[in-house]
Amino acid sequence: MKGIKFFYITCPKKKEAHKIASFLVKKKLVACANIINNVDSIFSWKGKVTKAKEILIVGKTMNKNVQKIIKSVKKLHIYEVPCVIFFDFKNGNTDFLKWIIKSV
């Protein structure tokens, strides 16, 4: 099914992840958001290799909402440059994919 996206957002704190995920679901920008604790992240930031425990938000949405999600996350997130990435769905449970489309 065309237009369905999987998204990936990282947060420094569980409370922030819940705030962002709840906002996106309430605004019907995403059909579903899953929060995964204790992700070990290693990244380059301002010339230094940095290690951090992060919280991961993953979920499902439609292409029509991508820019609204990015804008919302940038407003709500404490990171200067938050990670907000989208991937296309190739296939999946058709009933679940239809539910995503109806939910957003």
Summary of predicted features, one role per range:
Residues 1-104:
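Positively charged, small/polar-rich N-terminal and surface patches that mediate targeting and assembly
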